[in-house]
């Protein structure tokens, strides 16, 4: 187990201009399984035929690399082959510092979709929003471009510029945005004390420094305000990160030795249980990074804020705190990525990222495809979030892994029906807008999380204060 924890472990979604997801496990299932010789012979014959007859010469390395990528990516949305550059970028991202635009992206309908602009990044300052579709990178169309190539095109030297062509579904318009690349330093833990002695703790991603940084911030908060009466853990737009980070964050608020998450897959080493013990969450620290956290944080009334972009490691934390009834979950149903990916280094500095297990909350529930449902569904905007139906969750992903505990067909059908209804409603609404209203919407930005205009946060504060909370009326919640 200790050897496992020394390995590269992360759980996330998407590519963060770019990188992805995972948990490192150390064994291979069915090592003694017989090789499918006939199928391998067919592969060899196809390779030879291409080399002999293709219209132009093609390098062996390119042909075989593309074959491996196709083989792995056909499994599910999260398995992929990482070449030298991809693997290096993944390792760079977990350190919390990289160069680029600062957006988490995925692929949808042949184009690139923005999952989340990283806070205080060039992309966020340029006004990019979750759900925006990127159709062109400078003069190059994105359709037909691999996600890896799109990521590499967007990354670059700090100070250089790139123009993205954006299609925003909610406004039915396309427009160019020129962004200057910069070194992205992701501050994963942000805190402040709100009115009425309530602490707001925002975690943007789970990185190497997240647990010790959280411990430091919690200690500072307790010293600043000895009269604290509640804490709000904000996991909105958090696409995941290091597994140890998720275990450590949950451990800060749960009893010692509490089960945080378990994983189960085909191999023996994929069957693991992660508890609230230092050995399970410390990375580079000699002792327990949570040792100095005031005991009050184990008992304070607590709310966890989530939305459709809270995924993977975020869902582990929310699911654990919900199962133990340690916190009330407020917001929207989470993304629903309940699978574990192994990053296994290969030769030539490449790696294989492959789904090896499902993960389960302490009660044994799988959130795969369904996500973590909030105890109190609340909209991000006071007047509702009709555009939420356009958000792609795990269950909408092509080739997503099915949840073995629950039937998905009805939910998929209901979501598709609601999506069609909302698209029609949006089109009708946009058709009635005046030019002035359309121009005003172009300049409208979503409220900054943690600001005075953050409606969902205001409802979390109301809940802790014992005041009424405006529940979402969405049929999907």
Language-model region placement:
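Flexible, low-complexity junctional segments that flank or bridge functional domains
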Residues: 1-231, 235-239, 243-245, 252-255, ...
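C-terminal "post-core" interaction segments
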Residues: 4-5, 21-22, 189-477
């Amino acid at each position: 187990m200790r050897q496992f924890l020394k390995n590269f472990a992360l759980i996330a979604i998407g590519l963060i201009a770019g990188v992805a997801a995972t948990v490192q496990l150390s064994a291979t299932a069915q090592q003694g399984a017989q090789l499918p010789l006939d199928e391998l012979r067919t592969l060899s014959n196809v390779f030879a035929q291409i080399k002999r007859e293709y219209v132009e010469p093609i390098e062996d390395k390119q042909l075989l690399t593309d074959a491996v990528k196709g083989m792995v990516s056909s499994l599910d949305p999260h398995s992929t082959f990482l070449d030298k550059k991809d693997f290096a970028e993944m390792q760079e991202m977990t350190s919390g510092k990289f160069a680029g635009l600062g957006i988490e992206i995925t692929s949808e309908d042949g184009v690139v979709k923005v999952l989340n602009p990283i806070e205080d990044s060039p992309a966020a300052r340029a006004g990019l929003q979750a759900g925006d579709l990127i159709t062109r990178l400078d003069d190059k169309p994105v359709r037909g471009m691999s996600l890896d190539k799109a990521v590499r095109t967007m990354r670059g030297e700090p100070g250089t510029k790139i123009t993205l062509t954006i299609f925003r579904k909610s406004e039915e318009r396309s427009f160019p945005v020129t962004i200057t690349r910069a070194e992205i330093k992701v501050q994963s833990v942000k805190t402040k004390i709100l009115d009425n002695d309530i602490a707001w703790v925002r975690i943007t991603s789970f990185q190497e420094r997240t647990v010790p940084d959280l411990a430091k911030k919690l200690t500072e908060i307790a010293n600043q305000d000895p009269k604290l009466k509640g804490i709000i853990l904000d996991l909105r737009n958090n696409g995941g990160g290091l597994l140890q980070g998720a275990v450590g964050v949950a451990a800060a608020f749960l009893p010692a030795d509490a089960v945080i998450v378990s994983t189960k897959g085909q191999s023996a080493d994929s069957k693991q249980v992660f508890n609230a013990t230092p050995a399970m969450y410390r990375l580079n620290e000699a002792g327990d990074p949570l040792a100095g956290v005031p005991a009050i944080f184990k008992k304070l009334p607590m709310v966890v804020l989530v939305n459709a972009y809270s995924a993977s490691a975020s869902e582990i934390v929310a699911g654990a705190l919900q199962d133990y009834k340690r916190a009330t979950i407020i917001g929207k149903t989470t993304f629903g990525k309940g699978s574990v990916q192994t990053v296994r280094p290969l030769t030539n500095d490449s790696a294989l990222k492959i789904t090896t297990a499902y993960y389960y909350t302490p009660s044994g529930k799988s959130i795969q495809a369904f996500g973590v449902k909030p105890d109190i569904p609340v909209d991000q905007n006071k007047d509702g979030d009709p555009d939420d139906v356009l958000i792609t969750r795990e269950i909408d992903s092509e080739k997503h892994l099915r949840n073995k505990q629950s039937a998905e067909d009805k939910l998929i059908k209901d979501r598709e029906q609601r999506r069609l209804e909302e698209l029609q409603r949006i089109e009708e609404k946009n058709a009635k807008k005046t030019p002035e209203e359309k121009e005003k919407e172009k300049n409208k930005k979503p409220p900054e999380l943690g600001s005075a205009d953050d409606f969902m946060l205001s409802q979390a504060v109301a809940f802790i204060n014992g005041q009424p909370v405006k529940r979402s009326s969405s049929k999907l919640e």
